[in-house]
Amino acid sequence: MTITAPPKDEIISKFPGSEPLLNFYNELSDAEKSKLFHQISTLNLSEAHQWFIDSADQRAPSTAEDLKPVLDSQHFVQAELHQVILDGLWNKGMDAIGRGEVCAIVLAGGQATRLGSSQPKGTIPLGINASFGDSLLGIQAAKIALLQALAGEREHQNPGKIHWAVMTSPGTEEATREHVKKLAAHHGFDFDEQITIFSQDEIAAYDEQGNFLLGTKGSVVAAPNGNGGLYSAISAHLPRLRAKGIKYFHVYCVDNILCKVADPHFIGFAISNEADVATKCVPKQKGELVGSVCLDRGLPRVVEYSELGAELAEQKTPDGKYLFGAGSIANHFFTMDFMDRVCSPSSRLPYHRAHKKISYVNEQGTIVKPEKPNGIKLEQFIFDVFELSKRFFIWEVARNEEFSPLKNAQSVGTDCLSTCQRDLSNVNKLWLERVQAKVTATEKPIYLKTIVSYNGENLQELRHREISDSALESDHSINKFFVV
């Protein structure tokens, strides 16, 4: 039902600061007026003005003396742990899954604009699986289904379910919901009981002076409020999730094709250390611009490369590792109690400024497409809550096995579809080598079915078998394991 928009003067009176957004109000159709009025009434313009002011008043810049690596007692490297310890962590994580205590939250609000698509990034075809679930969300749904099956097979283990919470944005919610519904039906998930879909807020964009911008004569320029928008967006759902028995959250970005959703090792590690917050990281590479997980004035924080500076960023330890080498990959563990605390209205995160090129309608009604940054979008960062942690830990994993994001168009050549396909194939080959299968296939990538193996298990039947192009095409005892 369309809401009838009130007169222009009434809107200005009710929503201070909205007057410049109504310059062309009298030229709009009734439907366009209603749409603009709805947008103005939901963007919280009065608070947005204050957010812009506050975003310029951030903490004092950190100095080299302020920044220290996270203590060794809080930083564990998975590859350095004995298999017996890893098995124990896996079992502890699987126990939590079996009891239905784990919720996986995927941050899926982004569109695949850089990839040349208007679809949500989590739904675009990957060119890997021709049958079903050929998307990032499809791979992740299959991993959840497999973990649930593995939990159900364990002796004395309840067949627990992993709750899947999907954070979208206003521009991606409808398409993402339909995609996830199909995945849920395919894997036997109860969509209403096991899946929560919720949308992060949008915030108006600004020019450099803090004025709001029109994208068209009848719409305000607005954008999702960053991955830190998770906390305000999910807060209303926490009581229901707690009532379901959820105690632990695994939060991850949709674009990482190698993400181990609800990773039992990671969850078991965090539970064993009584962590309220834990984060996965990978060793940083030379010149890499990802943030570093470190201590800033004694509190855990992710510090951007630009803030570290080249000298600190390149500093090494006696054993040749980067001193600030814990590269953040936006992959986190939180307890329910911690989420309750940081999602309360009194724990609002700060906004950070991002200078962007923003197309807008000028006072003459002409659309302006700038060639350089001309405006500001505000974002909240998911990791800004780290400093509120009472027991913070890092879980360092192998980049080649757990981190390959899909961010760029194919023409860029890095973090693009072909590198994701390559890295997924390489992980699958690594698993096959560990069971001493002989991989001789060379014509195409090797993709194990996601539902077959989560972490290289269930592949003993392929021990000493030759994985060749012909075997993948015609030998059912082999090709039943693979996407062919």
Swiss-Prot record:
UniProt GO cellular component terms: cytoplasm
Protein name as it appears in the record: Probable UDP-N-acetylglucosamine pyrophosphorylase
Pathway: Nucleotide-sugar biosynthesis; UDP-N-acetyl-alpha-D-glucosamine biosynthesis; UDP-N-acetyl-alpha-D-glucosamine from N-acetyl-alpha-D-glucosamine 1-phosphate: step 1/1
Short motif (Substrate binding): ranges: 107-110, 304-305
Keywords of this entry: Cytoplasm, Nucleotidyltransferase, Transferase
EC number per UniProt: 2.7.7.23
Reaction equations catalysed: N-acetyl-alpha-D-glucosamine 1-phosphate + UTP + H(+) = UDP-N-acetyl-alpha-D-glucosamine + diphosphate
InterPro entries, per database record: Nucleotide-diphossugar_trans, UDP-sugar_pyrophosphorylase, UDPGP_fam
Main location, first listed in the record: cytoplasm
Top-level taxonomy: Eukaryota, Metazoa, Ecdysozoa, Nematoda, Chromadorea
GO MF, one annotated term: uridylyltransferase activity
Cross-referenced PANTHER family: LD24639P, UDP- GLUCOSE PYROPHOSPHORYLASE
Binding residues for substrate: 227, 407
Cell compartment(s), UniProt: Cytoplasm
Recorded family membership: Belongs to the UDPGP type 1 family.
Pfam families: UDPGP
Residues annotated to bind UTP: 107-110, 121, 200, 226, 255, 377
